[in-house]
Amino acid sequence: MFKNSKKKITLGISVQKFESKPNNWKTLIYQRHTITIEELVNLICEGHCICQNFKTASKTFGLREKTIANFDFADCIVLDIDDTFLSMNDFYLSLKDEHKPTIIYTTYSNIDNINNRFRLIYVFNEPIRSNEYYRGIANTIVYNIQKEIEGFDLKDKTCLNSSQQFAGNGNDNIVYYYNDNIDVLIFSRYIMAVVYLPNVIN
């Protein structure tokens, strides 16, 4: 990781904001924004949802356009951690510094030490331009977590694809964030070694 407080990333931000997890994801409308990490944290805390960047004809887009086939690029990778045996704080402290996420925040359904649910965002220093590469880096992140947290399993495998969307948390959330950007080479150099592991890919 390296410090860069002026680093900006581009991603889809929902026009709507929510006080609880959206009931109907099909109604969400997104617009592409280029923002700082701190601005992203503020939008998450306001209850906005986020997604990656897609090739669209208009400034706003929805579920129809948000597909793997339309994927344009990603400046970050987002992973859902559901029903893990560690609280968000303990999970974070268990990771080596080079594998810690840029942003980590609890989801709407999190109940500490009962139903631990949170989200990891890894901001990279260069864009990811294919779903295959996105999955490769995401799987490598999971692989490194599994090496450092014995018994960890990524239960929601849908977040390994670039087409996934993620809720913010505008209600009693806990957020850690750092103005650190991760060198994509830290993870990409291991892709060929782990991308075919059956216990990681689903």
Task: Report each predicted region and the residues it spans.
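Signature for HUH/AEP ssDNA processing cores
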Residues: M1-F118, V123-G136
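Feature targets compositionally biased, intrinsically disordered low-complexity regions
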Residues: L11, E46, F61, E150, ...
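Hydrophobic transmembrane signal anchors and adjacent membrane-proximal interface regions, especially
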Residues: L11-V15, T27-Y30, I35, V175-Y176, ...
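Poly-acidic low-complexity segments
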Residues: T60-G62, T67-N70, I77, D153-D156, ...
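Helical (often loop-to-helix) elements that flank the catalytic cores of nucleotide-handling enzymes
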Residues: N89-D97, V123-E150, Y176-Y196
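Long, charged low-complexity interaction segments
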Residues: I103-T106, I191-N202
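Short, conserved secondary-structure transition motifs
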Residues: I111-N113, V123-I128, D153-N181
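Short secondary-structure transition/capping segments
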Residues: E148-S162, Y196-N202
